[in-house]
């Protein structure tokens, strides 16, 4: 338990953003090697991803770990009120320091079971899945067939209740549209101007009407960034 707590605390302090979890990925790789796992890091052409395996035979159980932080959520550990560790810094507002460490604890528990059962009784694989917050690296890993070797894959998420959930989640597709206007003199040549915000508003109106014809399971959200 000391190893797990130490990793969780360090990941909390690192607070690295999606696809920049260099210290976090290296820490997991180091600890897992010390615990007797075979580690690939980087993995699947993702610099901060890793694959750590132990055992042989069937079944093959995959455990998914996440460890990325969020912008602007730096927080002193243990404080129940807002206290930044680093001014305007990153922080684990979604508890991914716990998620990754807890997933590793599960992998350790399965490893212990496999050691007791003996050679050929199964395999456990801990996948380090960076960039959950927006980058969706697990989708690319699935595309590459990474999880095809598993008979089952499990993960968890910190929360204020203990429960088992199942089901599906919506696919996340992000698209960026850029609108460019034409400047003109408001009094001398107003008809020559083209206001880009007008185009943005017209597009949003169209999206509002589109929602009526979409299935209940689909969602469209937008953000005007500039």
Which residues make up each language-model segment?
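Acidic/His- and Gly-rich active-site-bordering loop/insert found
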Residues: 1-92, 97-124
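Histidine/acidic-residue-rich, glycine-tolerant segments that coordinate divalent metal ions
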Residues: 48, 70-72, 81-91, 97-98, ...
